[in-house]
Amino acid sequence: MAGCAARAPPGSEARLSLATFLLGASVLALPLLTRAGLQGRTGLALYVAGLNALLLLLYRPPRYQIAIRACFLGFVFGCGTLLSFSQSSWSHFGWYMCSLSLFHYSEYLVTAVNNPKSLSLDSFLLNHSLEYTVAALSSWLEFTLENIFWPELKQITWLSVTGLLMVVFGECLRKAAMFTAGSNFNHVVQNEKSDTHTLVTSGVYAWFRHPSYVGWFYWSIGTQVMLCNPICGVSYALTVWRFFRDRTEEEEISLIHFFGEEYLEYKKRVPTGLPFIKGVKVDL
């Protein structure tokens, strides 16, 4: 796993990431530059170059690696916000850009606050997997092609709003799960129990056994509903369902090993929260 070479003072990564995320989001001021006489593309290129030069001047590795990622996500959020308020058929893609950047940035920020011992550059989840990258690129390609050839398909506002609500619900549920689990939450399934590892059954974990997966499940499908992507909408639903089916089974094998009868009792009374997924089968 990629990570920080030296451990900084507690909370410094969170503050650094927040400051540089906001710095990237300051691209929202770009319309002011265009009014001052700069052309849109020229202004954008100069802005990006200026941001990168500033980060190179202020930070050295490994802090630069944190800063450049957070700043990039802030930049995407700012561009998405500008696009959201534009009078174009791409406005809903702006919603998507904001949702995507906030998801990845908040994964890092919450981990930095909640469980700094497990924090690394991988906490941004930007390099989650090849499959994740291919899925994202496919959704962008589908939106672009359909927006060119069937633009009316991208103007179903009520459907995009439904997708946005799914995204907000999924994001809030996942972050609530991360905060509730505290130091017990980790982006990687653990095969060895740490001394501080406890079974969390309160809060959102009293509703679902895997609330962070439930949140991510509805968030990912919601992004495609928001984009009015019929092909990726169906393929995302099937793919993430299969992924979380396998993931919950893998995780529950470890949890049963860690907590034994305590987890089995919890498993009996609380559902996974994922449709048609019951978790690992246990022969008693």
From Swiss-Prot:
Its EC number is 2.1.1.100. GO terms for molecular function: protein C-terminal carboxyl O-methyltransferase activity; protein C-terminal S-isoprenylcysteine carboxyl O-methyltransferase activity. The keyword Methyltransferase applies. It is found in: Endoplasmic reticulum membrane. Residues 1-16, 60-69, 113-131, 175-212, 245-284 are cytoplasmic. Substrate binds at residue 247. Its main location: endoplasmic reticulum. Ubiquitously expressed. Expressed at higher levels in the cerebellum and putamen than in other brain regions. Abundant expression seen in the Purkinje cells and pontine neurons. It catalyses: [protein]-C-terminal S-[(2E,6E)-farnesyl]-L-cysteine + S-adenosyl-L-methionine = [protein]-C-terminal S-[(2E,6E)-farnesyl]-L-cysteine methyl ester + S-adenosyl-L-homocysteine. Catalyzes the post-translational methylation of isoprenylated C-terminal cysteine residues. This is Protein-S-isoprenylcysteine O-methyltransferase. It comes from Homo sapiens.
